Structure formats: structure tokens, C-alpha cells
Amino acid sequence: MNKKFICILLCASILISIGGCSPMSESMKAIEGKDGVFAIMETSQGEIVLELHYKQTPLTVTNFVGLAEGKLTAAKGKPFYDGLKFHRVISKANGDGQDFMIQGGDPAGNGTGGPGYKFPDEFVDELRHTGPGILSMANAGPRTNGSQFFITHVATPWLDGKHTVFGKVVAGQDIVNKTKQGDLIKKVTIVRQGEDAKNFTATQEDFDKRLVEVKEKNRKAKEEAFKKTIEMVEKKFAGSTKTPDGIYYTITKEGNGEKIGGRKTVTVKYKGYLMNDQVFDSSDFHEPLTFITAGGQMIPGFDIMVQDMKLNEKRTIVLPPDLAYGEAGAGGVIPGNAYIAFDVEVIKVK
């Protein structure tokens, strides 16, 4: 075979090779040269590229990736998110009065569905809802994460500490912004780049292992936070009496007669405030409060303390979370697991 013919064959093979390669997609260009775990979400409006925080929120990312790749038991061997829709969208593009977020990942398509299990939150201080393009878990309260997620249009700081942030948009925020309710998630492709990312697997075994680790981590964090809170309460309200229920109280004005007890109609003046002295409610804002003691109308700790008071008595009381608003908190003002204080005065008893 002569040299000229060999040269022609080589040139032809090079041309075929070049011509046969599809150009790199815009989504892949956005993450070219970057290490990490990424999700390319093909939607009715175009592609959204998400970087997943697999080192900071390993359980949540394992859940998302494992469902997307069909490797978790709940996915039944099929890509879980492919073909689902964005069932809840609040944005100007959707015809709403404000921009908020797009939400998807529900196989029921109405906000009630999930993978058939729930898992705990993974809150990380540096991962917050700071602006557009934050990928976060939708939930129905503490420890109720499943498959639903949302992506923000704007900063939503009121969701910090309530929803787990586990990723961010690195390309395609314009697609997020024009997504409308009912638009499809056609396909989710997981891309791993770099040695660490390529070693990150998301099988059912991985999920189960990380679930145990997160539960233990959260348990220790809760214990430490509780210990610090008790120390702060006892320092702030030094000299208070502590009841067996864990309520702290100080009588600031003695009352008259017998203790009120249960099934009495009482009227009280009050001021409620957090441990940072932020007032969340006060009878100064409206009329004094009238209720029947032991009637299930009030939070337990407040009711217990008023029953123990006398007419015209004043107390400062500090209630533990389990006798106040618990894990859920209240009104977007009282955080979950918060100690709260009241200044209370009984002004009428029937």
C-alpha cells in the first residue's frame, strides 16, 4: 500500500471522527472542568443545570440522585423523576403576583405524593435560601422529606432551618424563571466529575447507611443545643423556681386568695417574648385574654402556670418547647423547639 493512499485513509478517518461527534451541549459547557455531582434537568422549557452539595448534605443528595438514577428501592429500577411535572409554581411568568419558586418531584402531581418514605433534615449553616436558583427540599414539617423539591426565583430566608438546601442552579436560571405550572421534567441526568464525585454512589445501601449517620448527628446536635439553651435560660432568669415539668417562674407581685385551679374563667394581661426579648404577642396590642383554665384553649405551660396563680398575682414564666409550641413553632415567629417567656397578670377570676 503506497504512502499516498495511507495518507488519504488517515485524513478520511479524521474527517469522519470530527464530523461524527456531536457538539458539546450548553449544559455540559456550563460544568466543563468543574469537579462535583451535577444534575441536568431537561424540562418543557429547556435545561436546568444543578450542582448538588453531596459533601455537605450527603443523605439528601443520595436520595435525589438515587431516585433520579432509579437505584433506590422506591424507584423500582426506573428514573423516578422522568416524566413528572412541576405541580406547584408561584411566579410572575405563571401569572402570579410575585416570584417565589417552582416545585416538582411528586408522582401524584398534586403535592401529596412521594416515594413512600420520609427522612430527616440536613441543615447546614452556610447553605441558606440566599437568592435565585437555590435547590431545596419541600416538606410538610420536620423530618418529612421525600422526593419533592423546589428551586427559588428569589431569596427566601424565612425557609432557612425549615427546608434542606442541597444544591444550586449553575446554568438555566432563565429556564426556572419561565417555567409554568404543569411543565414537564422530561429527564434528569446525573453527571459526576472528579475523583471524589465519581466515588459518590447512591444505592439503597448508601441511603440506609447515611440515614443512620444523619440521625445520630442530628441527635447529638439537638442534645448540645438543648444544653446550651438551658444554660442560657438559667442565667437569664437566675433565681427562678423550676417546676418538675421544666417550667421556670418568678412571682413579681403576690396575689390574693386561693390558687385559681381548673375550670375557672380567668382574664389575664400578658406579654410573650423569645429568649432574645423579641415580643411576639401582648395584650397591649388588643384586649386582655379571657379563657377557661384546663379547658384545652391555651398552650399547656401557660395554662398550668395560670392555674397555679392567684387573683392580682404577677409572674414571669418560661416555658419549655414541649409545653409551648414544640418542634413546629408558631406563626413564622416562634421557632421550633424554642423556649418562650411570658409576663402574666391575673386581673379577673370567675
Q: What residue ranges belong to the model's regions?
A:
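N-terminal Sec-pathway targeting helices
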Residues: K3-C7
